[in-house]
Amino acid sequence: MTQPRNLEELGHRIAIQDLLTSYCTAIDNKDFDKLDDVFTPDAHIDYTSAGGVKGAFPEVKDWLKKALGLFPMTQHLVTNFEIQIDGDQATSRCGFYNPMAIPESSEEGAALRLLYFGGYYNDKLTLTSDGWRIEQRIEDTAWKDAQFPENSD
């Protein structure tokens, strides 16, 4: 990994790390409109390695609302940032660890089953007038320990 050349580049790296963390916070708080501050309006997102969808940001955002609505608890953590900046474009690869809880049944007060996912977010970013935004995300799920309850879709 090349070292940052100046304070401006350090600022960009910190801004990108903050953006990636903002994604996690928005997802875990189920504040999906905050994702508008993370992705470009025309971003392409691919979650298929984890069994999710692939498509344009607006459609994926709607899918996230529905899919993550099944989970009363999620915790998305990102680490090991590899960021390359070239002017107003950048690429990033970071590791993620994601424990999630899903009810064992549809009964009120059902016990929660924990599921665990780990892998990498591979992103292309662009610097806009509002700051850095992800224009492409490909999730690469490296492993999972996840047995969904029989009643879940």
Region spans (language model):
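Short structured motifs
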Residues: 20, 76-80, 120-121
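Charge-dense, low-complexity intrinsically disordered segments
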Residues: 6, 10, 51-54, 112
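Short, surface-exposed loop/helix-turn segments at secondary-structure junctions
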Residues: 104-111, 152
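Short, low-complexity N-terminal intrinsically disordered segments enriched in polar/charged residues
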Residues: 1-29, 33, 37-41
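Transmembrane beta-barrel outer-membrane domains
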Residues: 74, 114-116
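A solvent-exposed, acidic/Ser-Thr-rich amphipathic alpha-helical stretch
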Residues: 32-102
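Short beta-strand edge/turn micro-motifs at domain boundaries
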Residues: 91-93, 116-149
